[in-house]
Amino acid sequence: WNVAISARRENTLKEISESNENIKSFPLDVTDKTKCKEVFEQIKNHYGNVDICFFSTGTWNPKKEKDIDVEQIENVFKVNFFGTVNSIKAVEEYFKNKNSGIITIVSSIAGYRGLPNSTGYGPSKSALNNLAESLYFDFGRHNVRVCLVSPGFIKTQMTDKNDFKMPFLKTSEFAADKIYDGLINKNS
């Protein structure tokens, strides 16, 4: 496989891409619609063909205030939901014209059930669930598979911020293996 990766943290991207010659990094802030399109064009130009896009956008800032923080919720939606929408919009025409491919959207179990101090995160992931279900039909007419992945608690920098019990906490490697198996075996 040849893999293109994108994220805001360029130093992390560089570290990952230097560890494997089949991985190339393309820095990107998914909140920038224009940049999403530009980066996808760069990826297409570099590889010539794209078969799978895997969108795992996310930010999580637990809030313990007793009042709702509207600005914080808007920021979480800007990254988690609209960042994914921007990314999918950037690839939409390509996949529909190609009449094949897989678009994978990473949500969370938090999209199905609220979590403590999570007035932005859970609702943003719930919105992704609904988006994926809608796109399943819209892209399906073009033979493009839309998959929704809703993992439980995965040990990451984001979950390190949690101060509540996280049952069945798994490593990112474990999650990646399960997600890969599900996509390859069409269990999504």
Task: For the regions a language model picked out, list residue spans one by one.
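C-terminal helical subdomain
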Residues: 148, 164-188
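Residue(s) in the substrate-gating loop at a strand-loop-helix junction
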Residues: 108
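Active-site helix of classical SDR
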Residues: 88, 124
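Conserved glycine-rich Rossmann-like NAD(P)H-binding loop of the short-chain dehydrogenase/reductase
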Residues: 1-13
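Rossmann-fold cofactor-recognition segment
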Residues: 19-34
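Active-site loop immediately N-terminal to the catalytic Tyr-X3-Lys motif
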Residues: 66, 115-119
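Substrate-binding pocket helix/loop in short-chain dehydrogenase/reductase
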Residues: 64-65, 69-77
